């Protein structure tokens, strides 16, 4: 092998190796989760409430919190709405929301769906969704809409705490098909706002559902008792994600190798022509 041949081979090998390395660096080490707060909450307040939970799962997941576009109706008719209290949609004619309400409207839902779709697109990539109370109801609806390809959001897993099926008539079609993505459903035995039977009904719509039932009420639990469940769930999701990325990387690397060989052939031909001319 001449020095020129060796140089050409080294250049091609280096370029292919660099392409493979670039693909490998693009694989993240955490799954990313978009989080939806409950009624009368907002993204920042929800983030603060989940401080302990985030510490448990921080090694495996990154959580991004957004705020609903609608200000919730004031608790008292004569009072002014509180800007920090937000709502994803209203299901009562007076513009308020109640999880147990059946057959009502869904005022503002489409605007909120566009808000989440925009966050999914611009703040992503994301792999999962997490929601609490109204936010968990929303996550369930998004999963159903994604199954029917009626939203641009494509969650690979979801966490639903104190969730429930929406009673709004326009949402009924979202529950027509069973959903197969992995989900973790969290609810309290003494929840008086969203009774556990409502959360169980939501969980029943998912084929691959894991349930974490706690002894408390309407809140997102994050004690030592729940820690291992959270860790195991996100460990599994991260492993699935990395395995999927590795398969994609292998396919892309093969494609890059093929392209590199073609480029090498062209370079070899060019250098050979130059050598012939110098002879």
UniProtKB/Swiss-Prot annotation:
Q: Which UniProt keywords apply?
A: Hydrolase
Provide the disulphide bond pattern: none
Can you supply one Gene Ontology CC term for this chain's record? nucleus
Top-level EC class: hydrolase
The residues forming the signal peptide are: none
What SUPFAM superfamilies does this protein's entry cite?
alpha/beta-Hydrolases (SSF53474)
| E.C. no | 3.1.2.-
Which InterPro entries does its entry note? AB_hydrolase_fold, FSH-like_dom, LovG
Q: Name one GO molecular function term.
A: serine hydrolase activity
Annotated active site residues, numbered on this chain, are 133, 191, 218
Write out the similarity annotation: Belongs to the LovG family.
| PANTHER family with a match to the protein in the record | ESTERASE OVCA2
The name on file for this protein is Esterase CG5412
Q: Which organism is it from?
A: Drosophila melanogaster (Fruit fly)
Lineage of the native species?
Eukaryota, Metazoa, Ecdysozoa, Arthropoda, Hexapoda
């Amino acid at each position: 092998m001449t020095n020129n041949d060796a140089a050409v081979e080294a250049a091609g090998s280096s370029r292919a190796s660099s392409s493979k390395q670039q693909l490998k660096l693009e694989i993240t080490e955490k799954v990313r989760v978009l989080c939806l707060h409950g009624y009368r909450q907002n993204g920042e307040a929800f983030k603060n409430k989940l401080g302990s939970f985030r510490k448990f799962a921080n090694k495996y997941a990154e959580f991004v919190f957004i705020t609903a576009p609608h200000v919730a109706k004031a608790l008292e008719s004569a009072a002014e709405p509180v800007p920090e209290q937000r709502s994803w949609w209203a299901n009562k004619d007076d513009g308020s929301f109640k999880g147990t309400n059946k057959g009502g409207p869904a005022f503002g839902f489409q605007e909120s769906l566009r808000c989440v779709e925009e966050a999914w697109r611009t703040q992503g990539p994301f792999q999962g969704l997490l929601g609490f109370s109204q936010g968990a109801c929303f996550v369930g609806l998004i999963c159903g809409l994604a199954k029917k390809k009626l939203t641009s959001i494509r969650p690979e897993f979801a966490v639903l705490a104190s969730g429930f099926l929406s009673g709004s008539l326009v949402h009924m079609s979202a529950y027509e098909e069973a959903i197969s993505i992995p989900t973790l459903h969290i609810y309290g035995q003494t929840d008086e706002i969203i009774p556990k039977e409502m959360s169980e009904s939501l969980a029943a719509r998912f084929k691959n559902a894991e349930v974490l039932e706690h002894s408390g009420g309407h809140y997102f639990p994050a004690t030592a008792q729940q820690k291992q469940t959270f860790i195991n769930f996100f460990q599994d999701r991260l492993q699935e994600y990395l395995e999927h990325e590795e398969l994609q990387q292998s396919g892309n690397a093969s494609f890059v190798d093929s392209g590199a060989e073609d480029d090498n052939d062209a370079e070899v031909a060019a250098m050979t022509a130059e050598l012939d001319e110098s002879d």
